[in-house]
Every structure is written in C-alpha cells, then in structure tokens.
Amino acid sequence: NIKNWKVAYSMNLGFFEIDKEVEKNTIDILDRLKDLGATVEEVKINWNKKELEDTCYNYYAHLFANSIADLMPEHEDELTDYAKDVGLTATIINEALVKRKKIKHSSMGIDLGMTLFECNKVAGKMYEEFGPIIHEYDSFICPTLSIPAVKADINLFEDKVVINGKEIASPDLGWTLCYPFNMLCRLPVLSIPSGLASNGVPTGVQIVGKPYEDIPVFQVGYQLEQLEPWYKTNQFKPNI
C-alpha cells in the first residue's frame, strides 16, 4: 500500500530531450500513482550534462574497459562496435593518465583522462544535488529511455539519433536516462513498462529509492503491476 506516499518525478533529469510518446506514457504512470493515493510532485535537478557524460565514459573505463582492451588484439573481430570503442576508450584514458593531460575522444567530444577518484568526486556532487530530493520523498520516477527504441543495427558512434525532430549531440548516451543512476549505484532502481509506443515497442519508467532501501521500490512496482498486469495481457506478447 503506497497511499499517502510522496513521490517525486522529473521528466528529463534536467537536460534530456524526451520523445512525446515516452512523456505521455510517463504521465499515465504518474496518474496511476495518484489513483493509488500517492502525492506526486515535479522536482528540478541541476545536473551538468557535459560533466556527467565525461565522467560516465571515464568511470565505465575504470570499471571494466581495460579488460575489453586486453581482449582486442586477439578477439577484435568478435566484439561489437560499442565494445571496441569502450576498449579504445580505456587505452586513451591510460595514455592520458600517464601524460597527466586530458585527451578528447575523437568521435564523441568526451574529455578522457579522469582518475577514478575524480569520477567519484563528480558522483558525490551528483548526490549532493539528488540526495536531499530522494530523502524528502518516498520514491522518485523518471523515464528509462527518452525514446521508445533505436534501430537494432545502429552504430552509436556514426549514426544520428533524432528526438522530436532534433538531432541529439550524444547518440550513445543522450537517450538513456539510466547512466546517471549507474554512477549513483547505492540507489536501488527498478525499470517497469509504462505503456506502448505507436510502433508497438514498450516504453518504461525508472523507480528510484533511497540508498540501499530496495523494498519501497518493489512496493511501487508491485502496485503499478496490479493496475496493469503486463505479463498476463496477450496484446503485449509477440505473435510467435
């Protein structure tokens, strides 16, 4: 029961371009929360887009990219374009750290060469902004992706991603609202369907909770699932 809960939401986390169908389906979810007795309030998040994107690349490189870089000499033909770029990112960062000088990623305009300590400092700044919000409310809602889908064969480093007629500057990160919460990894996050887009692909929302408090996140997801039991509805099952 989430009656009398306070739920915060942000449609774009402050800087994402959001597809109109994603926005509509997110609003539908917020309306369902109101039907369940929750109070829903919009909040403003002042995160720096460029700082987050730079940090995300560097942070991921420190976490796992070096292991991919080690595989490239013998297994490059088995890796996706994305995996190869991640491995290349690791080698650029290692070079930048040795030279103690930032190097700009040629295809993305990302500044590489942040230490893991510097990445964690940015994550700390992010939490200074978001922490007071999540502690004031019982839960936080935002879209999972800003578009219903990208093409299955998209090359994230060469192809364009257009949302609402606007080409977004970061075709790899500019449509996924997940990565900020990957950097704030102490926060439990559950993604659930929010509805269908006109192309038949489901859209989603993220339910974010307080640090290490998983149960309230599942409570919100469970209550919404009872209103729309996706797994029982034939219209959402593939015709195979």
Go through each PLM region and give its residues.
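Active-site-proximal beta-strand/loop segments in catalytic clefts of secreted hydrolases
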Residues: T144-L145, P193-G195
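Residue-level signal for well-ordered, solvent-exposed loop/turn and beta-edge residues enriched
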Residues: K166, N199-V201
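AMP-binding (ANL) adenylation modules
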Residues: A149, G195-S198
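Amidase signature
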Residues: N1-T176, L184, Q223-I240
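A short, aliphatic-rich beta-strand micro-motif
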Residues: P188-I192
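Short, well-ordered beta-strand elements
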Residues: V201-K210, V217-F218
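A generic structural motif
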Residues: G14-F15, G209-E213
